[in-house]
Each structure stands twice: as structure tokens, then as C-alpha cells.
Amino acid sequence: MPIMTWIKDETVAIITMTNGENRQNLEFAKTLSAMLDEIIADKSISALIITSNDEKNFSQGIDVLWIMDNMQKNNHQPVTDFINEMDNVFKKLLLYPVPVIAAINGHAFGNGSIMSCACDFRFMRSDRGFFCFPEVNIGIPFRWGMNAFVKKAIPLHILSQMQFTGNRYTAPELEKHNIIVKACANQEDLMASAIAFAKTLQKKRGILGEMKKRLYNDVIKVLDADFMPPSAKIDSLMMSD
């Protein structure tokens, strides 16, 4: 069974994550990266929406059990590959030549929230789900590249509160700070609002892509500098005290 699928609604592509909590591992990163390439090859696509079909979750972030299992086996390469491939996904989303919208239908934690920040716009349900950066509670600080682009989506004074407390935020709270475009009443409102908004964004790929390259030039440099070589030790990303 696929972990994500995509369909077209007129000129809007909709990626739907279909793997429950949609935990992110190497398979997730490779699948999403390939799907982004497949979608953008369709010249009729003018916008992209990313969402989930799970009743509770958008994405619960990194597949920690998968990472811990590989670390216990001293099998660092798949995890290193995942981190680099996920950074590649972030770069693709940042530079995607059509607008990218996250339709957050449920919990977005850790890398799930971070991925939504790589998108251009965010919509979220008011009746279900929290948005949270729990890294401070599990001993995994944001990587440099993540910090570089999350700041485009969240004002720094709010981001510092979110990172340092690990608190959970609702859609109305995010809307208040313009982190999301709209706090939607329910699932139907979420998708209707995101799709209607996406269909207003009939922009030429050339100019939009160039604007993104210039706007995020410094961010991409930081992401590139974050590349993990094969010799990197994954446990160096975690802090115990």
C-alpha cells in the first residue's frame, strides 16, 4: 500500500499522505521527493497542496523508532541518507516553481510542523490537531537549515517560545500570529478553503521560481552546508544534558 498518493483537481495537485501518523523515514523522504518531481513535470499544474487522510494526524514528524533501531545496530548510513534526502525535500518545497500549500488536517509535530513551514502557505483545522515543536523535550535541537527556513513562516519571538517551551498550539492561535492563512472549522472547510485558495494562484512558473531562488538564497546555502557526509555519527545530533 502506498504511503502517499496524488491527484489533480483541475490545475491543482493534491498530495495525500496515507500512512497513519505519517512518520518520516528514508522511504518517506524518497517517495515525497520523487512525487514532487513527477508533479512538476506536468506543465498544467499551477499549485500544490500537501495533506493527510488520517483522522488525527497530518504528520507526527521523524520516525524515531526507525532511527533508534538503526542506531542500536550501529547502522548510521540509512539515517544519514534520510537526513540528507529530507533536506533535499525541504529545498524542493522552498524552490518549487508553483505555490505549495500545507492543509494541516491534524497533529503536526516536529518534522511534520517543520515540513509545513517549508511550504508557502498553511491552512489548519480548528476542531482537531496541535502544532508543536517537541525537540526541547526529546533532546534533539533544530538543525541549522531547519532554523533558517522555519523563520520565514513563524515570527522569531513566537518561534523562540515554541522551540523553548515545546508547547502545543491550536489553529486559532497560529492564525492570530499569521502563521497560517486560515483556521478552518472542520475537514470539509479545510480542503475547500485550501483548494479555492490554490486555484487563485495562477502564476507563471518562471517568475515565481526565480523569486523563490532570490528570496531563499541564503536559506539554501545553510541547507547545503548542513549536508551530512557518510562518516557522520547520528548520535551527534542528540543532546543528553
List PLM regions with ranges.
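Conserved CoA-thioester-binding segment of acyl-CoA-metabolizing enzymes
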Residues: 1-51
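Terminal peptide-recognition signature
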Residues: 15, 31-32, 50, 63, ...
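Hydrophobic/aromatic residues within transmembrane alpha-helices
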Residues: 50, 115-116, 174, 194
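Glycine- (often His-adjacent) and acidic-residue-rich active-site loop
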Residues: 52-88
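Glycine-rich beta-to-alpha active-site loop
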Residues: 85-137
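Well-ordered beta-strand positions
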Residues: 121, 161, 165-167, 182
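C-terminal long alpha-helix characteristic of the crotonase
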Residues: 124-125, 175-226
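Hydrophobic, secondary-structure "cap" segments at the distal end of domains
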Residues: 147-157
